[in-house]
A protein has these predicted regions:
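C-terminal beta-signal and adjacent terminal beta-strands/loops
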Residues: 589, 686, 696-702, 724-796
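Transmembrane beta-barrel wall of Gram-negative outer-membrane proteins
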Residues: 220-249, 254-303, 309-313, 346-361, ...
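Extracytoplasmic beta-strand/coil segments of soluble accessory domains associated
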Residues: 75-98, 114-159
Length: 796
């Protein structure tokens, strides 16, 4: 294909908190901040119970998008318990948190979730298996996984879009649909349960009252990219509804990378009575895409965009290949080495989510909420020598209560909740054979599984006085895994079938407490300290894959747990400046680490436990409006993650053991930064005209447990110019246009590098970087220079 186209928290937690055992801790919360602000905002004084008023209806609504102004010196109190309940998924008190408002991505080509989340410190993203499939990490939580999103919990308008097994996919996220995104950082299982070891993210669609009409937009640019999208919203009396729909297509910048995806996102709320609200949520995403093969580091340097890779026989240097059995079940009829385009590798998936929520106000000071979500993920994914095929329906129910009042003479907010979620499925792994369009051969394996989580959580927020606020919470959860793996082997030219059964039935019990203390001496400073815990159980599929990528017994996997300590501050000297800094230190036990398996293996990744590891780092964010119209923002993350107890066994005839204690955990970039300098004309005939220059920096990182091979880092520069104006028309409200150049200097860089396994010689010596650089199945290149323009019309 052508390339045309904390640190000073004056509030140390009591020593007793620091002595809590590693395997018994969790996390807590904060409060919603404006656009690109970070960490715990100020706590609001809780009002004494008052006579009920009709204001409950509006206060209970989800907050609108964050504005572009810095944090106010005095927070607005939450008028009702319903508002406090809504804030649980947006800004839980005491927890490092960032809200990215729509004004940060409304005037640029927001193609994927990465275009939003890079504005938050602590966040890193890498390309997954599809155009909008990104691996999102909070403090490096997901950097060791090869696809999808794990080790955090994701919500949309408060509805969970993470399935019970902990998997989330960003394919269904079109940034144009959202008004704000809340990033909650640090171990959070006390509040969000299983898999919230890194934190949580809540996407908020635009309120219907803000849309108040119809908007149509179109983005287009390099490599055949075209996004047509429509937004509609209206509030009439006690009812409001919003609808978003988009059709996105493109050729992709890597050979065999074309895509075609449609998304529908609907939200409606009906105030049946002054005390009762019913909300309905619907999301549907259809994805059809081709997928290139992940490369070795050497192949990346030779041919990053897979040019000249039509067939294996005529492939250019550096083309990725996959070996397919000619008969579709074994090697007796020979094999064929094919490129991704020749084999027809790709994905054809559907995701459907339906949710319903009922909220009832007993008074202004107490609200009860019940919520149910049906989430169905249907996949057909020939991504290599095999294709994963299956349907994964899940059910999620939660019921919670918030009450506001007094405790020991102090204003208090009490939160209690119970939850149950489950998923039951049968999925096949089928061999791909020559013939194009991912022709299927015989069944390689089948997994039948059940994954169930249920538990309780409680939380108390106490405003000790005007300066001090304390938070305590705990979550208790039971997780049940049941699975049966049937692996098929075929011998001889006729394929005589033998089967091997591996079963697993595991129960996990987890307790996750959290404690936080906030101190605000005056309107400029807020100091925070917190100890939180997280846990994440293995997935059923992890239990049946061994290090070679073959089907086998890996049922000894344990749940990972982490204990995290945060200390930080927010400094807001005036309305134009906000600086937030958080330092953290997290201790992991049995961390679940994933690495890529060789290309051609039935399974693309293998998961193991690292007995002990430590994660530490610093998150910083600056939002500085140094002159009218000008704005400078920075989001920076420093990460240092090491194994402290892990011995790796590597086989080559005999088995050799290597001590990895002290080594860096692979996949973790130590430094990441996004900085933007922008100007928007606020007055005069050019009002609405603006632009910005943006710099993204990602440091190099290790790809293997022995720390022998590094993926190179990169620096990218993006330029944007945009214009928005109101229209004097009976039918049109406004016109918005933009033009953006990304990767201005056309850097070739690594957008994704999955961890690779180390190898040894027959004598037990580890192979060096020169050998490891030939290990395939790891790297996707990032996009070269692109040009994108967009136009949006808002109708009355």
């Amino acid at each position: 294909m052508s390339r045309s186209t904390a640190l000073c928290g004056a509030v140390a937690l009591p020593c007793a908190l620091l002595a809590l055992p590693d395997n018994v801790l969790a996390q807590t919360a904060n409060r919603a901040l404006p656009p690109v602000t970070v960490d715990a905002p100020r706590t609001a004084e809780i009002r004494r119970p008052a006579k009920r008023t009709a204001s409950r209806q509006t206060a209970a609504r989800r907050p609108t998008q964050s504005t572009s102004t810095p944090a106010a010196t005095t927070p607005q109190p939450q008028a009702t318990a319903a508002a406090a309940l809504s804030s649980i998924h947006q800004s839980p008190t005491g927890q490092p948190q960032t809200t990215v408002g729509r004004e940060r991505f409304d005037n640029r080509p927001a193609f994927s979730v990465g275009d939003i989340l890079r504005e938050s410190p602590g966040i890193s993203v890498k390309q997954g298996n599809g155009p909008r499939d990104l691996g999102i990490s909070i403090r490096g939580s997901n950097a060791r996984n090869g696809f999808g999103i794990r080790n955090m919990v994701i919500f949309e308008d408060g509805f969970p879009v993470t399935q019970p097994d902990g998997l989330s996919r960003s394919d269904l996220i079109d940034p144009h649909a959202y008004g704000a995104v809340d990033v909650i950082r640090g171990p959070s299982s006390a509040l969000f349960g299983n898999y919230a070891t890194g934190g949580a993210i809540n996407f908020r669609t635009r309120p219907a009252s803000e849309i108040n009409g119809i908007e149509y937009g179109i983005d287009g640019g390099s490599f055949g990219y075209l996004n047509n999208y429509l937004t509609a919203g209206k509030k009439i009396g006690n009812f409001e509804a919003s609808l978003f729909a988009s059709d996105v297509r493109g050729d992709g910048y890597i050979s065999n990378g074309w895509f075609n995806t449609q998304t529908v996102n609907f939200l409606s709320t009906l105030h049946v009575t002054p005390d009762d609200r019913f909300t309905v949520k619907f999301i549907n995403n259809n994805l059809e895409t081709r997928l290139p093969i992940r490369l070795s580091l050497n192949q990346f340097h030779q041919n990053p965009f897979q040019e000249g890779c039509v067939t294996g026989a005529t492939a250019a240097l550096g083309c990725g290949r996959v070996t397919l059995n000619n008969n579709g079940f074994n090697t007796t009829a020979g094999t064929d080495s094919e490129t991704a385009e020749q084999a027809g590798l790709g994905r054809k998936d559907r995701r459907t989510i339906v949710g319903a929520r009922w909220e009832h106000d007993f008074s202004n000071q107490s609200t009860w909420r019940n919520q149910f979500v049906f989430d169905d993920r249907n996949i057909s994914q020939p991504t290599g020598s095999t294709s994963a095929i299956g349907d994964f329906p899940s059910y999620n129910y939660m019921s919670d209560f918030v009450g506001r009042g007094e405790m020991l003479g102090m204003s208090a907010t009490t939160y209690l909740g119970a939850f149950y979620n489950t998923m039951s499925w049968s999925s096949d792994t089928v061999q791909v054979k020559p013939g194009g369009n991912a022709t299927l051969g015989r069944l390689s394996s089948n997994v039948r599984g059940e994954h169930t989580n249920f538990g309780l959580r409680a939380r108390e927020e106490l405003q000790i006085n005007n300066a001090w606020t304390a938070v305590a919470g705990v979550g208790l959860e039971q997780t049940q895994l049941k699975g049966l793996n049937t692996a098929y082997t075929y011998t001889g030219p006729t394929g005589i079938t033998t089967t091997r059964l591996t079963s697993a039935e595991r129960d996990f019990q987890n307790i996750a407490p959290e404690l936080a203390l906030l101190y605000r001496p005056n309107g400029e400073w807020l100091f925070r300290s917190r100890v939180g815990t997280g846990y994440g159980t293995p997935q059923v599929g992890n239990l049946f894959v061994v290090s070679s990528g073959q089907n086998g017994n890996n049922t000894q996997l344990e749940a990972q747990t982490n204990v995290g300590y945060d200390v930080g501050f927010d400094w807001t000297p005036n309305n134009t400046t906000k600086l937030s800094v958080t330092g953290f230190y997290e201790f992991f036990r049995n961390e679940l680490v994933t690495q890529a398996t060789p290309v051609g293996a039935p399974n693309s990744s293998f998961t193991f436990n690292a007995p002990r590891s430590e994660h530490r780092g610093v998150e910083a964010a600056l939002d500085w409006r140094f002159h009218p119209g000008w704005r400078f923002t920075v989001a920076y993350t420093y990460l240092d993650q090491i194994y402290t107890n892990y011995a790796e066994d590597i086989a080559n005839g005999a088995v050799f053991r290597f001590d990895r204690a002290g080594n860096k955990i692979p996949g973790i970039s130590p430094n990441e930064l996004t900085a933007r300098l922008g100007y928007d004309e606020m007055f005069g005939p050019l009002k609405g005209l603006g632009g910005f220059v943006e710099v993204q920096w990602k440091d190099s990182f290790y790809m293997d447990n022995a720390n022998l091979l590094k993926a190179p880092g990169y620096e990218l520069v993006n330029l944007n110019v945009h214009y928005k104006t109101d229209l004097a028309s009976d039918y049109l409200k406004s016109l918005s246009v933009f033009f953006e150049v990304r990767n201005v200097f056309d850097k070739t860089y690594v957008a994704s590098a999955n961890n690779i396994g180390n190898t040894v010689t027959a004598a037990g010596l580890q192979n060096g970087a020169g050998i490891l650089a030939n290990t395939t199945g790891s790297i996707y290149a990032g996009s070269p220079r692109t040009f994108t323009a967009g136009l949006k019309l808002a109708f009355r």
